[in-house]
């Protein structure tokens, strides 16, 4: 059986093209496009990298390198909601360990794991750019300041 070439769905392709057209150089849209792909699929399908590289007029290994470099991109373990937890020094000093422990208590998983129902994955990241609100975490694109396990449980219940 012949393998067909991967194609983006029209809706996604249109969004990617809008991002590409926004910038003077196509390559400048790479992060926005990767976020768009991840938001659409829940992760970055490996077969999507070649068509994206073609759209951006970049070598495939450049796009692969960007995906590998940034820990905000998931290449596997599809989860509907990625909980990115800042583990930089400021957040660490302000209580990241308490946040991670609360997530483990509520979800029953450790960082890097996906809940059995496929809804949540805990992903430690280096910086979310919100040091004044430390410790911070994001559920997909929504940013939150961690205050307590009760507050965290309330936030996560919005995503079920």
From Swiss-Prot:
Cross-referenced InterPro entries: NuoE-like, NuoE_dom, NuoE_N, Thioredoxin-like_sf
Reaction catalysis annotation: a quinone + NADH + 5 H(+)(in) = a quinol + NAD(+) + 4 H(+)(out)
Cofactor-binding details, from the entry: Binds 1 [2Fe-2S] cluster.
Binding site for [2Fe-2S] cluster: 86, 91, 127, 131
Matching Gene3D superfamilies: Glutaredoxin (3.40.30.10), NADH-quinone oxidoreductase subunit E (1.10.10.1590)
One of the protein's GO biological processes: respiratory electron transport chain
EC class (word): translocase
Enzyme Commission numbers on file: 7.1.1.-
Keywords, ordered alphabetically: 2Fe-2S, Iron, Iron-sulfur, Metal-binding, NAD, Quinone, Translocase
Pfam families xrefs: 2Fe-2S_thioredx
Keyword Translocase: yes
Cofactor: [2Fe-2S] cluster
Any GO molecular function: quinone binding
PROSITE patterns documented for this protein: COMPLEX1_24K
PANTHER family referenced in this protein's UniProt entry, alphabetically: NADH DEHYDROGENASE [UBIQUINONE] FLAVOPROTEIN 2, MITOCHONDRIAL (PTHR10371:SF3), NADH DEHYDROGENASE UBIQUINONE FLAVOPROTEIN 2, MITOCHONDRIAL (PTHR10371)
The protein's role, per its UniProt record: NDH-1 shuttles electrons from NADH, via FMN and iron-sulfur (Fe-S) centers, to quinones in the respiratory chain. Couples the redox reaction to proton translocation (for every two electrons transferred, four hydrogen ions are translocated across the cytoplasmic membrane), and thus conserves the redox energy in a proton gradient.
Family from the record: Belongs to the complex I 24 kDa subunit family.
Descriptive protein name: NADH-quinone oxidoreductase subunit E
Species assigned in the record: Aquifex aeolicus (strain VF5)
